[in-house]
């Protein structure tokens, strides 16, 4: 896709907006991973940058960030609301507390 050779510590507005566009598409009851989003953008090595972009979502953007989990379905540590929001969308969890990606993974 695009070539983001710039310093990874400085997220470009373009990169963030592309991440936000993908997150907007995740339907209720589904989740995706940081790595899946990075791969969709053509930059599979940028999964951590996807996470950084989601940590700085502008107020009022109303993105369903709660639908993004790590590669094994683990939720964001310390963000209790994420579990509540996913429960409300009937997302199921395994015994270890991770989202059941076999049932709910969106690509």
Model-derived regions, located:
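Nucleic acid-binding interface residues in structured DNA/RNA-binding domains
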Residues: 2-107
């Amino acid at each position: 896709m695009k070539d983001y050779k710039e310093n990874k510590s400085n997220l470009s507005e373009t990169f963030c907006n592309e991440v936000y566009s993908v997150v907007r598409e995740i339907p209720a009851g589904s989740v995706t991973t940081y790595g899946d989003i990075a791969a969709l953008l053509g930059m599979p090595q940028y999964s951590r940058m996807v996470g950084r972009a989601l940590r700085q979502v502008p107020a009022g953007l109303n993105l369903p960030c709660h639908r993004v989990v790590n590669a094994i379905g683990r939720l964001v540590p310390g963000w209790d609301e994420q579990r509540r929001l996913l429960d409300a969308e009937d997302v199921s969890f395994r015994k270890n507390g991770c989202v059941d990606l076999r049932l709910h993974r969106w690509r």
